[in-house]
């Protein structure tokens, strides 16, 4: 049950982040993980997992020490 809840949270966050990405310009920096976690009322772990998926799929680029950027 906990895993199912986690996947549901990830799906909800991913949908919200995809909307955010659609309205962003390539190269635009996204809010920090803590800011996104607070905005979507989830843990930073959930944000990290979704960002990792989006990076693997080429939607964002994460730069250590700098942030996460839109790739389109």
PLM regions: where:
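Extreme N-terminal segment that seeds HTH/winged-HTH DNA-binding domains in transcriptional regulators
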Residues: 1-44, 49-52, 56-57
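Beta-hairpin "wing" of winged helix-turn-helix
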Residues: 29-30, 55-65, 69-72
């Amino acid at each position: 049950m906990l895993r199912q809840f986690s996947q549901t949270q990830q799906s909800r966050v991913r949908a919200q982040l995809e909307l955010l990405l659609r309205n962003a310009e390539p190269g635009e920096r996204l809010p920090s993980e803590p800011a996104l976690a607070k905005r979507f009322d989830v843990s930073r772990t959930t944000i990290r997992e979704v960002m990792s998926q989006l990076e693997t799929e080429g939607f964002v680029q994460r730069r250590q020490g700098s942030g996460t950027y839109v790739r389109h």
